[in-house]
Amino acid sequence: IARGRVAVAVLNGGMATRFGGDVKGIIEAVGGRSFLEVKLAQAQRFGRVPFLIMNSFATHARTLQFLAGHQLGDVAEVFLQSVSLRLTPRGDVFREASGRVSLYAPGHGDFPGSLRRSGLLERLAERGVETLLLSNIDNLGAELDPLLIGFHLARGRALTAELAETLPGDVGGAPAFVGDQLQIVEGFRFPAGFDFNQVPFMATNTFAISIALLEREYPLSWFYVEKQVDGRTAVQMERLVNELSS
C-alpha cells in the first residue's frame, strides 16, 4: 500500500430509496459524514491511495456535484457504467407511465468493462497499481486493510473474496461449488427455498482483485431479472461482478 501498488474502488450506482430517493453514496451515514466521505477517509488513512467511483446514469451528476461542493474532486476518479433499456416480459421496450423509455444500469458486473473503457485501468497500471479493493459504497466494514491485501498477495490468486459469518435470516450471495469450482454464487441462483443457514459464510461483494484479471475480457453471464416499475413487470438483463470468481 505504501508503495502505491493498491487502489480502492466503490460501486456507487444505487439510489437510497429508503432515505428519500437520493444517491446512496452522498446521504449521511455516520457522524455527519456521507458514505462516500467515510469510504474516502478509510482509504486515505494510508496516504494518497487512488480512489475510484463507478457511477450509474442515475447517480453521476449528483455525485460530481457533491464531490465539487466538498472539495473532493481532486481525490477521486469517477467513471460511468453503461445504461440499458428495460423490456416487457414479451420483449417490447418498456415505457414508464409518462411514455418515456425506462432506463436502468445493468448490474455491478459492468465494473470490469466500464473500468477498461474509461481508460482508468490503463492509467492505474502505468502508475504501478497491482491490486484493487472493490466494495459497495454502503458497506463501511469493507475498508482497506493491509491484512486482507497481504493475504491476497500471499495466496497468489487473481481474486480474493471477503466473507461474513452467516446470521439468522441472511440471504444473498455465498460461496458454493459449481461442479468442482468454488465460487461466489448470487442468492437467486440457489434452489428455491434454499436454507441459507446451512451456509457458514455469506458474500459481501467485497473483493481484492489483481489488475491483470481486469485487463482481459471476461465472459460474465447475463441474468434475467424482473422488477416492478410503475406497478407493472419490467425485465432487466444484469451481470454480476462476483462471477469473476468462477
Describe the residue ranges of each PLM region:
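Residue-level detector of secondary-structure boundary/capping sites
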Residues: M54, A58, S102-P106, L115, ...
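A generic structural motif
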Residues: D74-L87, T160-T166, D230-G231
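Short, charged, surface-exposed secondary-structure boundary motifs
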Residues: L87-G91, G169-G172
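Conserved adenosine/adenylate-binding substructure
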Residues: S98-R127, T131-N139
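Catalytic core of tubulin tyrosine ligase-like
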Residues: L124-N136, G141-D145, G150-S246
